[in-house]
Structures are given as structure tokens and as C-alpha cells.
Amino acid sequence: MNILIFGPNGSGKGTQGDLIKQKYNLAHIESGAIFREHIGGGTELGKKAKAYIDRGDLVPDEITIPMVLETLKTKGQHGWLLDGFPRNMVQAEKLWEALQKEGMRLDYVVEILLPRETAKNRIMGRRLCKNNNNHPNNIFIEAIKPNGDVCRVCGGTLSSRSDDQDETAINKRHDIYYNTTDGTLAAAYFFKKLADQGKTKYIELNGEGSIESIKETLLSKLA
């Protein structure tokens, strides 16, 4: 099973992705980790990407797409969940074209819907566990409120990202995601149109529910 997941920062996308990964034994592939592994591993694509990053430039899709595909092929042989890519319409079109060329299917596209203001509040209350960033801890959500500075799941030490407390940084991230013209939501809607054509399946989830209720709804639709 191959899945692409969309959702704004604060939607619980990482948490749901982690649950799906465990349920179906999928490779949970996050875009940031792809760059870190290729650059850290000194691959040819990683070296090219690093040259752009060191100059303060965006890595072009001609490098990013092959890196994503290579990771999907090597780590996702038994199924994958791709998280954090594509981020815009152009990348969505290029990714779909590349998947078709490689003969790789895309079984499901999942979108977690959440109002922008709710997403921002969740981000500012988010606390990260040193053992697993996807363990749900949020000081503003009673159901997953941590016990002080201790993870409610494993007891690990909690911390917060500096940019999670920066409203300007959050707004910039959300400006990209909620842009329906050429941003991340435009990319999601590209796949929604493909689903209308029977080329994949598109699942929309209400992100305002509890973690458990969202998980149950998602698993019932994936079954």
C-alpha cells in the first residue's frame, strides 16, 4: 500500500502517519529526513542538494524528485507513506509523472482538514518528546495534555521548537500550505482530481476530532 498524506502543521498528520505506518508496516518517509539522509550519506544527489542549500537557494525539483523516488524505491519496497511532499502544484504534477514513469502506484491520498486558526493554536501548544516527535503532547488539548514536562506516552523529556512559538514563522508555513492556487492545498487538489478520474483514491478527514476517532475513520476507509 502506497499513501500520500496532506495536512497543515498542527493537524496531527505526523501522529496519524505514525499510526498508519505501524498498522500496515509501511515506511514512513518524511521530506526533511530524505534531505538529511542524502546529504549526510554523501550521495550524488545529496551533494548537489547541499550545494544549493549552502548558497541559501531552494533545491530545484530536478534534484528533489529523484531523491524522493530513490527513497521510495529503496525504503518503501513493501509500501510507503510519503509525508511533507509535494508542497506545491508543480511538484505534485512532477511527482505524479515520475511515479507513472517508474510504474509505482499511488493507492490513497489522505487530507486532514483543519481550520487555519485551530492549526496555529495547536502548534503553539505542541510539545515534542525526545524519544518520538510523533507522540501526541499538547498543553492546549485536554485529551493529550502532558504531565508537566514529561511525555504522556513514554515518560520522555518534552521540549518545544522555537519556531512553534513564533507566530510569524507559523503564518509563513501556513501561507504556503493553505494556498489553493499554487501552494500545498493546490497540490492536494491536483490528486483529488486524479481520484475523480479513478486514478487513485482520496480520503478527507476532519482533523478536529480526537486522535482515536480520526484513526478509526481513516483505518475504516483504508480497509
UniProtKB/Swiss-Prot annotation:
Which Pfam families has this protein been placed in? Answer: ADK (PF00406)
Which superkingdom?
Answer: Bacteria
**Reactions catalysed:** AMP + ATP = 2 ADP
* Gene3D superfamilies per record: P-loop containing nucleotide triphosphate hydrolases
Gene Ontology CC entries for this record: cytoplasm
For region NMP, the annotated ranges are 30-59
Chain residues that bind AMP = 31, 36, 57-59, 84-87, 91, 161, 173
Per the record's keyword annotation, is Cytoplasm included, yes or no?
yes
Record-listed ATP binding positions: 10-15, 126, 209
Which InterPro entries does this one have? Answer: Adenyl_kin_sub (IPR006259), Adenylat/UMP-CMP_kin (IPR000850), Adenylat_kinase_CS (IPR033690), P-loop_NTPase (IPR027417)
Q: Which HAMAP family match?
A: Adenylate_kinase_Adk
**Functional note:** Catalyzes the reversible transfer of the terminal phosphate group between ATP and AMP. Plays an important role in cellular energy homeostasis and in adenine nucleotide metabolism.
Per the entry's comment, what about the domains? Consists of three domains, a large central CORE domain and two small peripheral domains, NMPbind and LID, which undergo movements during catalysis. The LID domain closes over the site of phosphoryl transfer upon ATP binding. Assembling and dissambling the active center during each catalytic cycle provides an effective means to prevent ATP hydrolysis.
Q: What is this protein called?
A: Adenylate kinase
| Organism the protein comes from | Desulfovibrio desulfuricans (strain ATCC 27774 / DSM 6949 / MB)
